[in-house]
Curated annotation (Swiss-Prot):
This is Tegument protein UL47. The keyword NADP does not apply. Interacts with US3 kinase. Interacts with UL31 and UL34; these interactions seem important for efficient virion nuclear egress. Interacts with UL41/VHS. Residues 57-84 are annotated as: RNA-binding.
Amino acid sequence: MSVRGHAVRRRRASTRSHAPSAHRADSPVEDEPEGGGVGLMGYLRAVFNVDDDSEVEAAGEMASEEPPPRRRREARGHPGSRRASEARAAAPPRRASFPRPRSVTARSQSVRGRRDSAITRAPRGGYLGPMDPRDVLGRVGGSRVVPSPLFLDELNYEEDDYPAAVAHDDGPGARPSATVEILAGRVSGPELQAAFPLDRLTPRVAAWDESVRSALALGHPAGFYPCPDSAFGLSRVGVMHFASPADPKVFFRQTLQQGEALAWYVTGDAILDLTDRRAKTSPSRAMGFLVDAIVRVAINGWVCGTRLHTEGRGSELDDRAAELRRQFASLTALRPVGAAAVPLLSAGGAAPPHPGPDAAVFRSSLGSLLYWPGVRALLGRDCRVAARYAGRMTYIATGALLARFNPGAVKCVLPREAAFAGRVLDVLAVLAEQTVQWLSVVVGARLHPHSAHPAFADVEQEALFRALPLGSPGVVAAEHEALGDTAARRLLATSGLNAVLGAAVYALHTALATVTLKYALACGDARRRRDDAAAARAVLATGLILQRLLGLADTVVACVALAAFDGGSTAPEVGTYTPLRYACVLRATQPLYARTTPAKFWADVRAAAEHVDLRPASSAPRAPVSGTADPAFLLEDLAAFPPAPLNSESVLGPRVRVVDIMAQFRKLLMGDEETAALRAHVSGRRATGLGGPPRP
């Protein structure tokens, strides 16, 4: 009987219902059975409607080669009293609101009143799922939102927005109204414009002014350069030395500068080359793309969340796959709003990416749209600084990774660096997942202004987003679980790369906390009038930051895969649910971000290296170019991060070695081009390398 026939027979059978523990050491994520509709592939088929039998066959083939998993006891850190006392509220200053038309304001205030009263009379199924924000706030006992001191310095230094509107540089007709093709015929133009008033989003500062400000980095010493606005020639050409310094807490300055040059060519320079020099598109079109992409991401977030939490779909799986679905569903942040409350999101299936050429450009280059000064200039003060800071720190992190990881010098990667990269991936996956949930709820609220669903009131609660980053206890728990235990603190203190990666995670934490709080403030309350333009800017800034977060996450995936599969390192470990969580995020965010597989990433890096004439070597530079750069200032910035969690429950699951889950990691996070390299490792033959064959 065919695989499809077996799947039909299984759909007719019923599964046993258990109450599983979400953190069993023998999680079915680790055990990949053979066959078509069982285990991981059966689960993915149910959640994503995967109907390609070739995926199932590949999964069975890879599962037969996979070594038995190693079971590890989960290590839990205990927050100290000092860290808890340091978790204090530090929120961006409030800005003045734009007055709204009187009729629209009155309608919004009445809708807000209905939402507030709905919290007590509606069944709880809000932004945080079954958790009531009032109960969460009662357990917080103090703010867990601890902004980066470097970010606060930059925010305090930032001047106010220009008092008068700034003219667009795009020429006549440069302020298009919001258009979302996937909602065509279901939402009128005025309704969509009320939800996303692009015609009111004039530049808050001049693009040239924002370009100059992006080159300033308060508190950053020489060697850790801020993100520029064009390619620069600070790095030496020729050999790029990847040997680790005698003190792993520092970088060779020359190699770091070369890594920063490579990072700029694969991120900011690539997007600016496509937008400014080739496509000749405009920041206003980029904002139109963001609105369309964010609505599609919201639809996909709702679809994925619904499939994760629909009990009826368990009948299509065997017991093992149904167990996996239940375990992950109990931990995921994707909590869909009821279909009746969001008919515009729930009317169809998953939303594909926009097919236009401009959209393809905006999705490319590792999510680097926020490196465009003209786009950042359209954001308000706090959101603009948040996007700029996230872009700067993720750029520095990308440069630092490319100064330590390269297919031509795999053996130079230190175990401590590979181990910490896995922990960073854990946190990035949780941050991305929670951001997708936030966008799904917020877009649902803006497209359905008369709905009284409690989730819509949750995302407008200032107190919730002042107390927790993204208003989520799960984000705080994941950050502390991955970066707050004794092992993680030791890894941070003994590696310069780890300090830079930790600072990048902290920057994304700070930026997302800032823009989501800004949205809650813009929604108004009894003391403040609603500001739809400011709220729309906060949503767009969140989309920009999420796109760059995904680009950094793909970079980390490429480095983890390189160390584990090409270098044979056993150091990289991830949470049990991290590959599955990140795969769900990548599915949902396809309209916003074109993912980069490890093979594609290293091919782009190799092309950039050839462009600037760099050749990797496993040696160390000699005097007089053997000077070092110390990122110790970032360790000082990280003193209060991560904040203490609300409880000791695991969000990530038991840690597993990446080499022990080869098949799952490849199927979920890597392209088909890596299959040959993985099979070579399993069979004991010499691997050909994830980035293509090595140079002779």
